[in-house]
Amino acid sequence: DFNAKEVKSEIPYQKPFAEILDIVHEYPVLDGDPLENNAYLSYNMVIGSGLDVKLNVAFSVLEYALLDAPGAPVKQALLDAHIGKDVYGSYEDGILQPFFSIVAKNADENEKEKFLSIIRGTLEDIVKNGMDQKAIEAGINYFEFRFREADFSSFPKGLMYGIDVFDSWLYDENKPFAYLQQLAIYDELKKLAKEGYFENLIQTHLLDNTHASIVTLVPKTGLAAENDAKTAEKLQKYKESLSKEEIEKIIADTKELAAYQEEEESEEALETIPLLKQSDIKRESIKLYNDEHEVDGTTVLHHNVFTNGIGYLSLLFDTKNVPNDLIP
């Protein structure tokens, strides 16, 4: 028996910052690792709401165009200025408030202001002179292809779609399928790209946005040992605060949990797992239709199957007249 309890599970939005935060932390490195030019510099911005699917798709495209595409302008500008040995970006979605990051690795922590200045200067120039339309188009096509193909390798497609549902459903119970309905967005973005849409996104969310942070991670030798010592001291103090009976109960509970985890399930419990019956499986295999055509003297076989709008082309050549040493 139980009584229903009203639980407020809504995840609240973090309030925007009045100004960009400047945060410095240390991170552990091994003895002998260099301390000079081994910092991480990152510029991070909160981007709207995870429930805005079009905005999230657009920023995935924008991250590609600015930082991943060949000759990506922000990455190239930082590398040309020798800010770090590697530069990369990320757009973290699937959360209530996605964020966009630009990171320089193996950098000089004293060049933080230069790092930020180059990023902002490059973005301002893009807003003024326009995005590289080919990079935007390539990004849109790339993400549209991934969405259409939905290749999850060895993972079941239904399982992965079920996980994708939580990208919106966790934050709005009325929007479980928001991220499964993206096709129309790609067509819309192709049109908007020619109307200054992506330049406006840069101005609004990357240049005029104070809900952001500059994070510097500085290497420190021996930090891992310091943290381990602090943890050990904290645990020792906690143990000393316990009575003998409390310690014995913790030991007993731990043994009980380990035994519970290792014991085999009962037959009754195993029978509660839903299983497919033989009658649930279709005996008929999927039929493949081979429609044969002639195109300019070449035989073409067409298979009319569902591919979610993607055309797959395989070219087969007779190699009987090709010498063996030329066949890979």
Predicted features, each with a name:
Residues 2-52, 64-117, 132-160, 164, ...:
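Non-catalytic beta-strand/loop surface segments
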